[in-house]
C-alpha cells in the first residue's frame, strides 16, 4: 500500500530508507537547532538507526514521504505501541498517566491507543499537504490495532500545535516531563 500525490509517495520505510529517515530526524531535532530555527518546528524524540529499523520492522512504525523526482525522504512519521516505546522515559511516563485523561468520554489507556510522532517534514516541502498524507497513511496502518492516536506537543512548539489542531487532534490536557510542559492530544484512527 502506497499513497501517491503528484511526485510525493507515502509508504512504510524499508531498511534502505532508515539512514535517510534518521538524517531528517536529526536535521530538525531541537538539540541541533538554534532558538530562532525552532520557531519553524522541531522534534524532541531521538532514535538511533537501529531503533528506527526495529520500530519499522516490529510495529510498521516508520512512515515516510519520498519525493520521486529526486528519490529523497522528505517527511517521516513515527508511531508505535506503548509497550514497544517503553524504553524511552518520556513514553513510559506518558503511558503511566494516560488514564488521567479523557477522550470522547472515555479514559485513555495503553491497550486502545498508540503513540504517534514525531512527525517531521523538510522545510522546503511544508505547506504542501505532506504532513496530512503521512497522518492519513499512518492512521490506516494502525487502525486495525488501535482506535485512538495519542501524541504530545511541547508548548514551545506552536507550529506543531497548529498542525495537530488543524488535523482534528483534540487537546485533552497538559503534563510536565523533564522540565518541559506538553499538550496531550488525541485523535481517532478512523
Model regions: which residues?
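A short beta-loop-alpha structural element at the N-terminal edge
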Residues: 7-23, 34
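Conserved GNAT-fold acetyl-CoA-binding loop/helix
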Residues: 29-51
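A short helix-loop-beta-strand connector motif used in the catalytic cores of GNAT acetyltransferases and
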Residues: 50-64, 82-89, 115
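Conserved acyl-donor/pantetheine-binding loop and adjacent beta-alpha core of acyl/acetyltransferases
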Residues: 78-118
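Conserved GNAT acetyl-CoA-binding A-motif
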Residues: 112-116, 142-154
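Conserved beta-strand-loop-alpha-helix junction that forms the acyl-donor binding cleft
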Residues: 117-126, 151-161
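Conserved acetyl-CoA-binding loop-helix of GNAT-fold acetyltransferases
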Residues: 121, 127-140, 166
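Conserved active-site alpha-helix within GNAT-family acetyltransferase domains
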Residues: 132, 155-173
Amino acid at each position: 500500500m502506497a499513497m501517491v500525490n503528484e511526485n510525493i509517495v507515502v509508504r512504510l520505510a524499508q531498511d534502505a530508507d532508515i539512514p535517510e529517515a534518521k538524517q531528517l530526524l536529526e536535521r530538525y531535532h531541537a538539540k541541533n537547532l538554534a532558538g530562532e530555527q525552532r520557531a519553524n518546528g522541531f522534534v524532541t524524540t531521538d532514535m538511533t538507526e537501529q531503533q528506527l529499523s526495529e520500530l519499522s520492522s516490529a510495529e510498521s512504525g516508520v512512515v515516510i514521504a519520498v519525493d520521486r523526482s529526486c528519490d529523497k525522504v522528505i517527511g517521516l512519521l513515527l508511531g508505535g505501541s506503548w509497550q514497544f516505546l517503553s524504553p524511552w522515559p518520556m513514553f513510559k511516563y506518558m503511558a503511566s498517566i494516560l488514564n488521567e485523561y479523557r477522550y470522547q468520554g472515555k479514559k485513555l489507556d495503553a491497550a486502545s491507543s498508540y503513540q504517534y510522532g514525531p512527525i517531521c517534514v523538510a522545510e522546503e516541502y511544508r505547506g504542501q499537504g505532506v504532513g496530512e498524507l503521512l497522518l492519513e497513511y499512518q492512521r490506516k496502518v494502525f487502525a486495525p490495532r488501535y482506535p485512538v492516536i495519542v501524541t504530545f506537543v511541547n508548548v514551545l512548539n506552536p507550529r506543531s500545535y497548529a498542525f495537530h489542531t488543524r488535523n482534528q487532534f483534540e487537546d485533552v490536557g497538559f503534563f510536565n516531563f523533564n522540565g518541559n510542559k506538553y499538550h496531550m492530544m488525541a485523535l481517532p484512527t478512523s
